[in-house]
Structures are given as C-alpha cells and as structure tokens.
Amino acid sequence: MNKAIITVVGQDTVGIIARVCTYLSQHNVNVLDISQTIIDGYFNMMMIVDYANADKDFGAMVGNLEDLGDDIGVRIRCQREEIFTKMHRI
C-alpha cells in the first residue's frame, strides 16, 4: 500500500468533493479515509488515499491535483504519508 495525504482548502462551493473524488477514481486511486468540514464558508478536507494502483506516477498526480485545485478555486496539496507524518511529528 502506498498512502498519501491530500488536503483541500478554500472558499466553499458546490462540487469540490465530487471533482476531487472523480479525478482520483479515474486514475485508480483508492480513498481510504476522508474528513471534511466547512468553517465560516471555508471548505477544509483531508483524505488518506492509496495510490499503489494509480495509472500515473506520484509526481504527475500531485501536479494534476494542484491544477484541479486552480480550476475549482481551492488549494490542493498531496504528500506521501511518511513525509506528512515526519513533518507533523511533535
């Protein structure tokens, strides 16, 4: 299993989850866990995904997700789980 953490932050609008999940599904990335909330009109989502069977390499997926975020007006970041964990260790 190759896990990654995807975060999505921005002004809330219709279809954010649908667009992100559609991209992931189209490229054979499995969503393992998802949490989202809206705080005062701002959308926040964190996903744990498995990209082991993805049809794109990790770097291409990261770039595509950033571009998708630009298209829908949010900021999308994707990091390998081990990097995310090391960065957020207390």
Curated annotation (Swiss-Prot):
Residues covered by the ACT domain = 5-79
Checking Pfam families in the record gives: ACT_6
Taxonomically, which superkingdom?
Bacteria
Family, as annotated: Belongs to the UPF0237 family.
What's the protein called, per UniProt?
Answer: UPF0237 protein BL1209.1
